[in-house]
Curated annotation (Swiss-Prot):
Transmembrane segments: 28-48, 57-77, 102-122, 142-162, 200-220, 241-261, 277-297
Extracellular topological intervals: 1-27, 78-101, 163-199, 262-276
PANTHER family for this protein: OLFACTORY RECEPTOR 52A5, OLFACTORY RECEPTOR 56B1-RELATED
Species of the source: Homo sapiens (Human)
Glycosylation sites: N5
InterPro entries reported in the protein's UniProt record: GPCR_Rhodpsn, GPCR_Rhodpsn_7TM, Olfact_rcpt, OR51/52/56-like
Protein name: Olfactory receptor 52A5
Amino acid sequence: MPTFNGSVFMPSAFILIGIPGLESVQCWIGIPFSAMYLIGVIGNSLILVIIKYENSLHIPMYIFLAMLAATDIALNTCILPKMLGIFWFHLPEISFDACLFQMWLIHSFQAIESGILLAMALDRYVAICIPLRHATIFSQQFLTHIGLGVTLRAAILIIPSLGLIKCCLKHYRTTVISHSYCEHMAIVKLATEDIRVNKIYGLFVAFAILGFDIIFITLSYVQIFITVFQLPQKEARFKAFNTCIAHICVFLQFYLLAFFSFFTHRFGSHIPPYIHILLSNLYLLVPPFLNPIVYGVKTKQIRDHIVKVFFFKKVT
């Protein structure tokens, strides 16, 4: 690996150290992380199977849930195998290109998940506020366009981050990344060159995706609450609100974890590094773990079909 004035020029590989300060207990940390991964994959796979084979669930609300489940599986799978390789098998090395590819996948799937949550909020808004137009607006073609749109938005907005790293950052102080996966700022901060453009673009993407989605999700639910509370019958209000509970829970835990991780990383300079890394890991691992549980508990149709799958023979 060529060096120049003490810096590394165009490194061929990086070293991921995992969770700095907790190297001695990483093998134990990997146990709950792997358990969350397995539960998340099984739970989300079960939701996908139920929605695929149950024709009554082939409606926008559950199609978006299937998109969310598939995204959760993909996001977790981008992170955990390599993380466990570091924690359990002492395999910290990752090639430069593989690291950038992992970074692109992780941030793209995060953006896709945010876009799906926005689509789910808009679906509930139309279903509750203008129900007579729901079937017309959320046609099969429109659902396909939404899926392609959130995917392309994520991929296109994240790609320039790779170009800025690959083409503009040539010299690195070290090849050791103090993280358990390849995260954008963790890589950028290793460079000796001016990284202001990278930082600005990173903030632009965060606000263009998360900021945009949060604003419109919030506006959707403000209008939903206004409409629900104007319903004359208490039973009708409860029924309408009940269709939103699971999505509200998923929305809150996804964005609260995201912003908590974001602000502690940028403004919590006095917080130990291992706290930052643990929060980043939890932000990515907890939503895919909790989402199928939340929807399994809070959504009657999903809950009934899970009971049918596991206890059908006993019931009959």
